[in-house]
Structure formats: C-alpha cells, structure tokens
C-alpha cells in the first residue's frame, strides 16, 4: 500500500497532461480513430461493453461494438454514443462473421475476446469467428488486442499467425 501511495503522489497534473496527445482544435470524432470491439455473449455481457466504453474514455473518436442482440441492447442503454453492429448467435454466442471484413478494414484497432465464450467453453462456430478476425487483422495490418476468451482460444492453437501489432 505504501508503494501505491508513493506512486500516486508522483502523478501530477502536468505528468498526465504530457502523456496524452493534445486534441486538435478543429478535430472531430473521425479524427481520433475507430476501435472495433468484437465480443460478448448471453453470459458475459459486461466485458465487451466496458472495453468499448474504455476505448472512448481513452481517446478513440468512434467505437463499434460487434456482438449479439442481447449485448447490444444492454450497451445501448449504458453507452448510447457507441456504434452497434449486430452479429448472429447460436446458444447465446457469436457464430457469424457477417461483413466483419469491412468493419475491420476501416478500424484503427480491434479488441477481440471480451466475454465471447459460452457458459463453460468457447463454441466451435465462435472459434471459427475468432480465427477469421485474427486472419483479417493480419491481412489488413490492423492492431489487435486479445482479451479473455481470445487468449483462451489462442492457447489452444499451435500454428496461428498473429498480426504484427498484437497485444
């Protein structure tokens, strides 16, 4: 606890101001990048919603949440400034890549895996979607952030090529 207090005392307004780039006077939401978050399921709605909200808080101009209807309905109440892209579901999980190619091509970054799994495991069709998104990010050189079940999926793969800028 003492170390945390010392670090907190070292964080000043000037330090924080210098970390984040200055916003352009004539900038608009399109100026500051577009994050696409692909995740969420019937059981884990919050993870993808919080990741989407965090991307806006950290400075992204636009954020599209690509998920199943149940997740998008909840997200629209909590954060109406998000953009929404509905995906088909089977047994509460994402099962389709529906035009994700266009969304990913236009993205500045993709977040994949937050809450995307099922009640006990990741369904096969969801795994296919994850694999497809990773492949598209690699093809178009889009930075990829893997989280939660995205990492769980990755741990089961032997020969998967990740995009160069993957976290």
Question: Predicted regions span which residues?
Answer:
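Short N-terminal helix-initiation segments at or just after the protein's N-terminus
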Residues: 24-26, 53, 106-107
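Substrate-binding N-lobe of the ribokinase-like
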Residues: 28-92
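Residue-level detector of functional hotspots within protein domains
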Residues: 16, 21-23, 49-51, 70, ...
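Glycine-rich phosphate/dinucleotide-binding loop and adjoining beta-alpha-beta core of small-molecule
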Residues: 4-5, 11-13, 66-167
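YjeF_N-associated NAD(P)HX repair module
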Residues: 1-38, 42, 153
